[in-house]
Amino acid sequence: MTNSTLPPAQLHHLPASSIKSGAVNGAAADPVGTNEKFLQILRAPIDYLLTIPGKDVRGKMMNAFNQWLQIPEEKLDIIKEVIKLLHTASLLIDDIQDNSRLRRGLPVAHSIFGVAQTINTANYAYFLAQQELNKLDCAAAYEVFTEELLRLHQGQGMDIYWRDSSLCPTEEEYFEMVGNKTGGLFRLAVRLMQLASNKDCDFVPFVNVLGILFQIRDDYLNLQSDLYTKNKGFGEDLTEGKFSFPIIHSIRADPASITLTSILKQRTEDEDVKRYAISYIESTGSFEHCRRKIDELVGEARMCVKDMSPEDAKVADGIMAMVGLGAGGLSI
């Protein structure tokens, strides 16, 4: 007797009652997403992270961009939900890949729910976000979504590769990585909004610069901000062994020195060693280089919107302030 002629219960090694319930043979016992008890368990890492207050920079930026794009509120809410799910999922995965201990001042999700459950929940959130796209009723949204998710993972992959291989990238390579990784969700949000808008305008170049600015500022604050220390831990990028923007500049400022690369390889949690590393980075002028690069990129961002009316230019200023880059430059 071949498998195709076996009774269903014998074929699947399950009692016939399981077959009758619809648990196999191509049908779930319940439609997707209706078992509230299971969903609560599955969503727990996401819901935990969402209870920790954040700045909601992306949501506020979308509100600001909508002063230009003027899409219906219900479509804006859908796009916000897509970005929120993707951002939360990426944080869950980032904290695992970076061996982080704190997120916004509280224990990371995987230290509470476990690594396996947290990874599964993050993957689930990616598909929840994709499912939300149905509500936009726009076929092009799926292409944009897939394109930006691929870029995001490409950027993350290079960041991890450099870290784990102890290979210091060039600044140009860093900008490409950040454009894919950090800029991805900013760009996805604006591209989806542009698809839903009747306005004929392209803010992607502006958003590309904002993504790089946001990451350089984050790299700077990781090693310079007391508030960042409270939320994420002291000099976390050094413990992670990450090639952040000031670290890349510092290493390349004196290629003959192995001091900083050696510290990165140690994945040290010793605060005295990290303080020494920060003083070394300061001695190579790398924090000053960060500030100069931020000023330069702020100028580039303003050039992207230079032809706007004074009223629209105020919106651009507000968006810059949201990423910590007001009229006076870098803010903490």
UniProtKB/Swiss-Prot annotation:
Site annotation (Important for determining product chain length): which residues?
126
What does the record give as its pathway?
Secondary metabolite biosynthesis; terpenoid biosynthesis
- Report the GO molecular function annotations: (2E,6E)-farnesyl diphosphate synthase activity; dimethylallyltranstransferase activity; geranylgeranyl diphosphate synthase activity; metal ion binding
Question: Binding positions for dimethylallyl diphosphate?
Answer: 103, 181-182, 215, 222, 232, 242
User: Any idea which positions bind Mg(2+) 2?
Assistant: 94, 98
**So what does this thing catalyse?**
isopentenyl diphosphate + dimethylallyl diphosphate = (2E)-geranyl diphosphate + diphosphate; isopentenyl diphosphate + (2E)-geranyl diphosphate = (2E,6E)-farnesyl diphosphate + diphosphate; isopentenyl diphosphate + (2E,6E)-farnesyl diphosphate = (2E,6E,10E)-geranylgeranyl diphosphate + diphosphate
Summarize where isopentenyl diphosphate binds, as residue positions. 55, 58, 87, 104
InterPro entries, per database record: Isoprenoid_synthase_dom_sf, Polyprenyl_synt, Polyprenyl_synt_CS
One GO biological process this protein is involved in is:
terpenoid biosynthetic process
Q: How is it used?
A: Diterpenoid pyrones display various biological activities and subglutinol A shows insecticidal and anti-HIV activities.
Provide the cofactor list for this protein.
Answer: Mg(2+)
Which keywords annotate this record? Answer: Magnesium, Metal-binding, Transferase
**One Pfam family of this chain:** polyprenyl_synt
Residues the record lists as binding Mg(2+) 1 = 94, 98
> What does the cofactor field's note say?
Binds 3 Mg(2+) ions per subunit.
Enzyme Commission number(s) from the entry: 2.5.1.-, 2.5.1.1, 2.5.1.29, 2.5.1.10
Instruction: Summarize where Mg(2+) 3 binds, as residue positions.
Output: 218
Query: In UniProt terms, what function does this protein have?
Result: Geranylgeranyl pyrophosphate synthase; part of the gene cluster that mediates the biosynthesis of the diterpenoid pyrones subglutinols A and B. The first step of the pathway is the synthesis of the alpha-pyrone moiety by the polyketide synthase dpasA via condensation of one acetyl-CoA starter unit with 3 malonyl-CoA units and 2 methylations. The alpha-pyrone is then combined with geranylgeranyl pyrophosphate (GGPP) formed by the GGPP synthase dpasD through the action of the prenyltransferase dpasC to yield a linear alpha-pyrone diterpenoid.
Entry similarity comment: Belongs to the FPP/GGPP synthase family.
Name the UniProt record assigns to this protein:
Geranylgeranyl pyrophosphate synthase dpasD
